Swiss-Prot record:
Pfam families in UniProt: PNP_phzG_C, PNPOx_N
Pathway: Cofactor metabolism; pyridoxal 5'-phosphate salvage; pyridoxal 5'-phosphate from pyridoxamine 5'-phosphate: step 1/1; Cofactor metabolism; pyridoxal 5'-phosphate salvage; pyridoxal 5'-phosphate from pyridoxine 5'-phosphate: step 1/1
Record text on subunit structure and interactions: Homodimer.
Superkingdom as given in the UniProt entry: Bacteria
Claim: Oxidoreductase is one of the keywords in the record: yes
Name of the protein in question: Pyridoxine/pyridoxamine 5'-phosphate oxidase
């Protein structure tokens, strides 16, 4: 099935994977590239998606945060093998408003909030006990009080410029459709060789 708008097709596939995928279907590989052209990739979780793009949250002091600050162009991959499908997205990062980041942060578990405050993500952890002690101290300090969102922890939206849908076929005759953004609301569609 092909749709005029790739977000509509993404929604159809996403609903299919939600029904058939036992593990977290929101897991997506995020690939970034530093200013010196060294790529890196890791799994992050999709928290929202819409016509505007694909949202995740992160510590901007982490390696991925630093690379995004240097180069806002990224790729995402959803590998949904259980339904023999994959979605690949290329786009540019835009930062969510502090209010949007605050709203999502408030929905996280208290432990996740405290961990986000205490973790120096991607830095060398020389003494794990010190980290655990800091978590315990902060837990006591904020007992019965809201845990403030650290300014470096924020939401990011990948605004898609290209979305490719891949579906497995017999004898490796796979189906691939590539949508390329032509303007704010328009897309061109081509089929690619497998």
């Amino acid at each position: 099935m092909i749709t005029k708008d790739p977000i509509d097709l993404f929604n159809i596939w996403y609903q299919e994977v939600l029904k058939n995928y036992s593990k977290d279907p929101t897991a997506m590989v995020l690939a970034t590239c530093s200013k010196d052209l060294k790529p890196s990739a890791r799994v992050v979780l999709l928290k929202q998606h819409s016509d505007e793009g694909f949202v995740f949250f992160t510590n901007m002091n982490s390696r991925k945060g630093k690379e995004i600050s240097e180069n806002p162009f990224v790729s995402l991959v959803f590998d949904w093998r259980q339904i023999s499908k994959q979605v690949r997205i290329e786009g540019k990062i835009e930062t969510l408003s502090p209010e949007d980041s605050d709203r999502y942060y408030a929905t996280r578990s208290r432990g996740s909030q405290i961990s986000a405050c205490c973790s120096k993500q991607s830095n060398i952890l020389e003494d794990k006990q010190e980290f655990i002690t800091n978590v315990q101290k902060m837990t006591k300090e904020f007992m019965g009080k809201p845990v403030p969102r650290p300014s470096y922890w924020m939401g990011l939206r990948v605004v898609p410029m290209l979305i490719e849908f891949w579906q497995e076929g017999v004898d490796r005759i796979h189906t691939r459709y590539q949508y390329t953004r032509t303007d704010k609301h328009g897309w061109s569609i081509v089929e690619l060789y497998p």
